[in-house]
């Protein structure tokens, strides 16, 4: 879609932003859009990265290459490990440290608007990749923030209004890892023994091109693919040594929920989730992972002989709710590989016997326990009702408005609030905005027939 297709709409949408943008350092106005295209000279970054969204062609399946959207990265300043490129089409991994100051220059070389959201990172509002800050082809946006997160796994992805799900499906996503002093004392597996695993399911045309949801219903409700990709690659097999590894798993799928388990029935050992490292390791028979969720798993291949394999799979499960209510059996939601079916995800092939391996700590990091005494809004719980009407998702009965908010949605910064989040119908979706990858509607119209959830 061309730049001119948005001019009238954006003029009406962003007129009110002029005064605000002029007051913010580094912000300029482009057709009454707030564009943060200049670095703040007072901000002294420890890490500086250039990130470019562009079209690329990559080999995923045998035969023709697949056309994708891709983040290309370049490290301008900082430790060499701050940026790590993965094979496949996903963006580079950003490896950051607590307390670092980070500057990222985002360039858009796509023919449609885009903006980047740092999912799970604690950053100022104007650095979070809100859709109001989207940029067009040939423009740039400058992000500057200090890393306040504790050690854990996060990610970044497109956050363009009504295009989020489609752009992520095409490839605009990547991992972020954060480390801190507490984590470094634990001696967890690192370097080549710290493995990122981005799980995605995709549909392909006969010509090996991504096939995004067909029709309004699939784009609104999400859909399942029939090919499982790990780090952008099909039929994934990873060579490992007979020692302990740290697996960082992200569900980057459109709508699929995985029930993670080992093919030999061994339990899983979780050491971290979306919020970071756990207080202590948790041993579980399986782990459910919804779209946008992350989990960190400790796996020890010690005692396994070279030539053997261990497969991480999605175990069979029942009881999936269809988007319009009612239970589903083994028929897929919007076709594709059936939800709840059992299938392999990635094989780990033991190729080398080694004797040195770290031990799993009994304790990881202390976590402060919150109580009712910590809450600032005692007796005034904030309600967030998730619903749907007229094919648009709603929060508290309202569709998304770029600059509109209810009084109850204004939360004082640095306070602990009690919030009740609930569904007022039977729609399915994970926390953190899923729908998010599930293609849920941001509310009020479409761009080119593609709808994306705003809650990511």
Place the predicted regions along the sequence by residue:
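Hard-cation-handling environments
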Residues: 314-315
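C-terminal substrate/ligand-recognition segments
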Residues: 383, 388-391, 404-435, 455-456
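Long intrinsically disordered, low-complexity regions that are acidic and Ser/Thr-rich
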Residues: 434-456
